[in-house]
C-alpha cells in the first residue's frame, strides 16, 4: 500500500483541472531534516493571479501549493510519505530579468505515520509552516531555499515536530 502512495499522488496531481487564467508550476526540492534525514518533494502550484501593495519596490502576491514529500532516514520513522496543501504569500521585489522574493505560508499535511525520522509527531495530521527566499527569472522559472516546520500545534501529545530545509527548483507548465 505504501509503495502505491507515490503513484496515487502523481495520478491525482496530473488529473487536477487548472483554469486557463491561472498559471501552474511544477517544483522539485531536495532537503535535509534537523535529524540528519533527507526529504524529496514534488509540488504543484497555482498562481493567485492577484497583486496587492504594488509599488516600485515590489508587490505582494501568492499561490496555492500541493505537495508530496518522501521522508528518508531515522531509526523508527524511515520511509514515510506526506501530502500537503498550503496557501503561500510571496513578496516579489521589482526587477527586470531576475526578481528576488520571500515567501511564507501555513497549511496542512497528512503523514503516512506518526513517526517521521526520529521524531514522534503524535498525529498523522499536522500543520505546515514555511518560510523561503529565492529568485524568479523572466522565463518563469524559480530557484530558492525553504524551511518547512510540521507539528500538530499541541493538539495531541507527543508533539516533537520536524523540519525540512531544502533547495527547490520550479518551472511553469
UniProtKB/Swiss-Prot annotation:
Statement: the UniProt record of this protein carries the keyword Transmembrane: yes
Phenotype when changing residue 84 to A/C: Does not affect LPS deacylation activity
Membrane topology listed for this record: Multi-pass membrane protein
Signal peptide: 1-23
EC number per UniProt: 3.1.1.77
Free-text disruption phenotype from the record: Has similar growth characteristics to wild-type in LB medium at different temperatures (25, 30 or 37 degrees Celsius) or in LB medium supplemented with 0-4 M sodium chloride, 0-1,500 ug/ml chloramphenicol, 0-5% ethanol or 0-1% chloroform. Only when chloramphenicol is present in the medium is a difference in the ability to grow observed. The difference is most pronounced at a concentration of 650 ug/ml chloramphenicol, where the absorbance of the wild-type culture after overnight growth is 1.7-fold higher than that of the pagL disruption mutant.
Regulation: Decreased activity at low temperatures (15 or 21 degrees Celsius).
Protein location: Cell outer membrane
Active site residues of this protein: 149, 151, 163
Keywords of this entry: Cell outer membrane, Hydrolase, Membrane, Pharmaceutical, Signal, Transmembrane, Transmembrane beta strand
Catalyses which reaction(s): a 3-(acyloxy)acyl derivative of bacterial toxin + H2O = a 3-hydroxyacyl derivative of bacterial toxin + a fatty acid + H(+)
Function: Has lipid A 3-O-deacylase activity. Hydrolyzes the ester bond at the 3 position of lipid A, a bioactive component of lipopolysaccharide (LPS), thereby releasing the primary fatty acyl moiety. Lacks fatty acyl chain-length specificity as removes both 3-OH C10 and 3-OH C14 fatty acids from lipid A.
Protein name, per record: Lipid A deacylase PagL
Organism encoding this protein: Pseudomonas aeruginosa (strain ATCC 15692 / DSM 22644 / CIP 104116 / JCM 14847 / LMG 12228 / 1C / PRS 101 / PAO1)
